[in-house]
Amino acid sequence: MALAVRVVYCGAUGYKPKYLQLKEKLEHEFPGCLDICGEGTPQVTGFFEVTVAGKLVHSKKRGDGYVDTESKFRKLVTAIKAALAQCQ
């Protein structure tokens, strides 16, 4: 069973390419293990929120910014690995 990863991003802000880039990187890192879905908000929210198995692990609104550095990406990878370990 694939692990749910949900990204809510500001659609009105044009963040969809950032979501698609993150999705591609995560699919490369965890081939066949993740069910990644993205939702763009129609209004300006500034959101780029990443939830793994129902737990918020990255939030632009809380000061994390975008997932635009290797350290931020590694933080997500660590959270996903921990969630996958709990599923086994």
From Swiss-Prot:
Cross-link Cysteinyl-selenocysteine (Cys-Sec) per UniProt, renumbered positions: C10-U13
GO annotation (BP), single: response to lipopolysaccharide
Keyword Cytoplasm on entry: yes
Outcome following mutation: U13C: Increased sensitivity to hydrogen peroxide-induced toxicity
S-glutathionyl cysteine: modified positions: C37
Gene3D superfamilies registered for this protein in UniProt: Glutaredoxin
Locations listed in the record: Cytoplasm
Listed InterPro entries: Selenoprotein_Rdx-typ, SelW_related, Thioredoxin-like_sf
Induction pattern: Down-regulated by hydrogen peroxide. Increased levels are detected after treatment with L-buthionine sulfoxide (BSO) before exposure to hydrogen peroxide.
Tissue specificity field: In the embryo, expressed in the developing nervous system and in mesoderm-derived tissues such as heart and limbs. In the adult, predominantly expressed in brain, skeletal muscle and heart.
A Pfam family of this chain: Rdx
Name this protein carries in UniProt: Selenoprotein W
Gene source species: Mus musculus (Mouse)
